């Protein structure tokens, strides 16, 4: 069994659920995840890559925590991504957030810098540490760090 635990920092929504059991992803739970990780600015829902959930499960397991991930940003519509690109530094034009393959998080009760180190040690996908904003970006793209 693999589970997820999320608290969305912008909407206050929470989800703790088993998303994989008996050798299969649980479609109903994946739909709940898609909804919680939607673009909260536009309310647009998009499929979240199950491999991203697996990455988060492994990250939480490796740090030895059962705390919820605090979600800063997950799926972003193209409109939201463009708005953020114009108003912020470090937002990619072709962000993996627009594909449901990236998430920005912190883990309750765990130092964010250390979370980034552990995420990099998994050697899976991209990992960005944003110290000033106190979050870690992880995605299911090619392995890279910033």
Which residues make up each language-model segment?
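Intrinsically disordered, low-complexity
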Residues: 1-31, 142
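Catalytic cores and adjacent binding grooves of peptidoglycan-active enzymes
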Residues: 2-7, 87-146
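Loop/turn elements at helix/coil->beta-strand transitions in domains of secreted/extracellular proteins
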Residues: 13, 65-69, 123-126
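Short, solvent-exposed loop/turn and secondary-structure capping segments
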Residues: 17-18, 83-85
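Active-site acidic/histidine clusters and adjacent loop/turn architecture
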Residues: 21-72
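Short acidic/His/Gly/Ser-rich catalytic and metal-binding motifs that mark active-site loops
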Residues: 26-28, 80-83
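Cysteine-centered nucleophilic/redox motifs
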Residues: 55-60, 77-80, 105
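Acidic helix-start/capping segments at beta-turn-to-alpha-helix junctions
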Residues: 68-82
């Amino acid at each position: 069994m693999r589970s997820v635990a999320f608290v969305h920092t912008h909407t206050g929504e929470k989800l703790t659920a088993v998303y994989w059991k008996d050798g299969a992803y649980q479609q109903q739970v994946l739909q709940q995840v898609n909804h919680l990780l939607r673009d909260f600015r536009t309310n647009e829902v998009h499929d979240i890559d199950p491999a991203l959930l697996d990455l988060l499960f492994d990250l939480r397991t490796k740090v030895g925590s059962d705390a919820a991930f605090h979600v800063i940003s997950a799926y972003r519509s193209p409109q939201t991504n463009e708005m953020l690109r114009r108003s912020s530094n470090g937002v990619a034009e072709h962000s993996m957030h627009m594909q449901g393959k990236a998430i920005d998080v912190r883990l309750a009760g765990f130092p964010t810098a250390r979370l980034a180190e552990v995420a990099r040690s998994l050697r899976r996908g991209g990992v960005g540490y944003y110290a000033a904003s106190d979050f870690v970006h992880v995605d299911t793209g090619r392995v890279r760090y910033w």
